[in-house]
UniProtKB/Swiss-Prot annotation:
Taxonomic source organism: Emericella nidulans (strain FGSC A4 / ATCC 38163 / CBS 112.46 / NRRL 194 / M139)
Function summary: May be involved in a process influencing telomere capping.
Protein family: Belongs to the RTC5 family.
Superkingdom of the organism of origin: Eukaryota
GO BP annotations listed: response to oxidative stress
GO CC annotation: cytoplasm; nucleus
Biased composition regions of type Polar residues, renumbered to the chain: 15-26
Residue span of region Disordered: 1-28, 165-194
Compositional bias of kind Basic and acidic residues: 1-10
Localisation per UniProt entry: Cytoplasm
Entry protein name: Restriction of telomere capping protein 5
């Protein structure tokens, strides 16, 4: 039974256990775009979904489809209701993302013939293509992906203004020789602007590739754009509504109930979401004529928001699981699998932050979602939220005070990666700033030669600004920088405070020079933990951080900051969403063991007995211990203890 033959399913009650969604059709040399589009949908269905997923998909579609003229399809309200996406009909929620998602689906449903078929009616075949493209399951059919997917997403969001093109003089008065346009107008972004463009020579190759379903060129077909005559833009209003939806559903896991994230959007929550959306939006430079161009969109997404569209995957995967199906009466062996697939997960909405010594005054659900758009998990193929990384509270000025001793005690004893966050005020403009650094490796002191990490070597550190606008400086993978001992990612000293992304000058007995900014970005925090300097440059590849791929023109090269709060969160990788993995225990236990050792040593020093009642041997032993610990004696003693870098170092002369 064919997808386009929905009228044959008027008596549809339940799907077949072995679905055959598409009819076997004869190959025709004059196959039109709709037939080729159907063939691509068939290949997507058979190669990208399991038979059980197809069965669930078909059940979801036909149970909710609207029928008109023998054609079954989904309208905007049906799609929004199924995905639990708020739209303009929800007066208590100004999110209004339903029309944007429907617009995207109507465009992607016409793939790869957006020029002639878009906007498409959301039939089953169209929805199959939408789900495959938005969940990135097309890898088994299409050999190209990420860059062209960004182009597709841009086309699905863009408002296009096409320049008027004067026809050559010889064409005047020959309108009768021009074929009438198709009744399906499509999206202007995909209309060919120059019929003599060189890429026309590839049309037959693209059609042959699509017809044979070896679709290397499928993204190119019907998408020829002459950049000299097109002005394609995404309006800020459209993109803002999509960003707000992505911020709300960013924590969404597969099969999680979407309404957990969309039903309780009060005014305070929506204000926070709007602020983060505006910070992200500010990273996309607007054209003079208004809106966001394709080049800006593609460059900014690639360099600054590699995981921005990740929430769309679990969102649209809900189409692959139906609540109505019960296979227990048909397949006893598959009962467990079917029941699990047909029952959405009731999320407990567990926070990414673990309980500890303080609660964050910087992190909020919206900021965490913002972080997940560019921060990886233990490997760079998953974002911070989808990789099940948890955040363990390590240090906070609000909880532990602005003391370097306290910072050293809490941070340098944490043997895992950290998320460094700072909230303060720009002393020049008065703007409130939120910035930070992602440090997948443990903090190092000058006496530390090696450290281990549970993060992949492909996960690099980064320096970022979250508000009032987004800037991301990725870590430099060059061995010439990584292997240099004088360019640590993060550096701590009681003489100069905290330095991230700086060059550390060699020290001497007479003077100790402060760290100096290096490369494209650095952060320097004074010993009082009350002020900081942020340096960002559009050039410089010799430092820890590379220049930002997208930098707003209003950004400054140097920003002086009054610190309101500073927080350090330990990165706890693990597969257990409750954060009870052995890795988490290892990180916490290592820190606790270090603290216990320090406490025992302090207790020993406190109970050293120098009274006359002790024998000479005991007296000498006690004196040696105190001199070694730096409690008594001077620089000419047999030993001394230094906590300059937050660790105990024995020095013998």
């Amino acid at each position: 039974m064919g997808v386009g033959q929905s009228h044959e399913d008027a008596g549809y009650t339940s799907p077949d256990l072995t679905p055959n969604l598409f009819p076997s059709s004869k190959n025709k040399s004059d196959a039109d775009a709709e037939q080729l589009s159907l063939k691509l949908a068939e290949r997507f269905a058979t190669k990208c979904f399991t038979p059980l997923e197809l069965t669930h998909f078909k059940d979801n579609f036909y149970q909710r489809a609207t029928e008109q003229g023998g054609l079954k399809y989904w309208n905007e309200k049906t799609l929004s209701d199924f995905l639990s996406i708020p739209d303009h009909s929800d007066s208590h929620c100004p999110l209004d993302a339903g029309p944007v998602i429907f617009r995207m689906a109507s465009y992607l449903g016409a793939f790869p013939f957006q020029n002639s078929l878009a906007p498409s009616v959301l039939t089953l075949e169209a929805l199959i293509k939408v789900v495959v493209l938005l969940t990135e399951r097309y890898g088994k059919v299409l050999r190209r992906g990420q860059k062209n997917r960004i182009r597709l997403l841009f086309g699905s969001l863009a408002d296009v203004a096409r320049k008027e093109i004067e026809k050559p003089a010889e064409n005047e008065g020959k309108e009768e020789d021009i074929p009438a346009p198709s009744q399906t107008r499509g999206f202007d972004i995909d209309a060919p602007a120059n019929d003599n463009y060189d890429e026309d020579d590839e049309d037959d190759l693209a059609l042959a590739a699509l017809e044979s379903l070896d679709a290397i060129e499928v993204f190119k077909h019907d998408s020829r754009i002459d950049k000299r005559v097109y002005e394609a833009r995404i309006s800020l209003s459209t993109f803002r509504r999509l960003l707000m939806l992505l911020l709300v559903i960013a924590p969404l896991k597969p099969l999680e109930d979407i309404s957990n994230y969309t039903v309780d959007l009060n005014e305070t929550r929506m204000l926070s979401v709007r602020e983060e959306a505006d910070s992200i939006l500010a990273a996309f430079e607007q054209e003079a004529s208004g809106g966001i161009s394709y080049k800006t969109f593609a460059d900014t997404i690639t360099s600054s928001f590699p995981y921005l569209f990740d929430p769309l995957t679990p969102l649209f995967e809900h189409l692959l699981f139906s609540k109505n199906l019960d296979f227990s009466q048909h397949r006893g062996s598959d009962t467990t699998e079917a029941e699990q697939m047909s029952q959405p997960v009731k999320s407990s909405l567990a926070s990414i932050t673990l309980p500890g010594s303080f609660e964050s005054t910087i992190l909020s659900p919206s900021i965490i979602s913002h972080l997940s758009f560019f921060l990886p998990s233990t490997s760079d193929n998953q974002n911070l939220l989808h990789g099940n990384v948890r955040l363990h509270p390590v240090f906070s000025i609000a909880a532990h005070g602005s003391s370097l001793t306290s910072f050293s005690h809490n941070v340098l004893t944490w043997q895992s990666g950290t998320l460094f966050l700072l909230y303060g005020q720009d002393t020049d403009t008065g703007d409130m700033l939120t910035l930070g650094a992602y440090l997948p490796q443990p903090w190092k002191s000058p006496t530390t030669s090696q450290s281990t990490s549970d993060f992949s070597s492909s996960v690099l550190p980064c320096l970022f600004l979250l508000s009032p606008y987004h800037i991301l400086l990725r870590g430099n993978p060059s061995p010439s920088v990584v292997d240099k001992p004088n360019t640590p990612t993060a550096y701590f000293s009681t003489h100069h405070g905290i330095a991230i992304g700086c060059r550390i000058p060699p020290s001497s007995r007479t003077q100790k020079l402060p760290p100096t900014p290096l490369g494209a970005g650095s952060l320097v925090i004074g010993t009082s933990l009350e002020s900081a300097e942020l340096h960002i440059s559009p050039f410089g590849h010799d430092g820890v951080f590379l220049p930002p791929g997208a930098q707003p023109t209003k950004s400054k090269s140097e920003t002086n900051i009054d610190i309101y709060n500073l927080e350090v969160w330990g990165l706890v990788p693990g597969s257990n969403p409750n954060g009870s993995s052995s890795l988490q225990k290892s990180a916490v236990e290592l820190q606790q063991a270090s603290w216990d050792f320090e406490a025992r040593e302090a207790e020993r020093r406190r109970h050293v007995n120098l009274s006359a009642g002790a024998g000479d041997s005991a007296l000498e032993q006690a004196r040696w211990l105190l001199e070694t610990a730096g409690v008594i004696g001077d620089s000419s003693g047999t030993g001394r203890c230094s906590r300059q870098y937050g660790v105990v170092t024995m020095c013998y002369q």
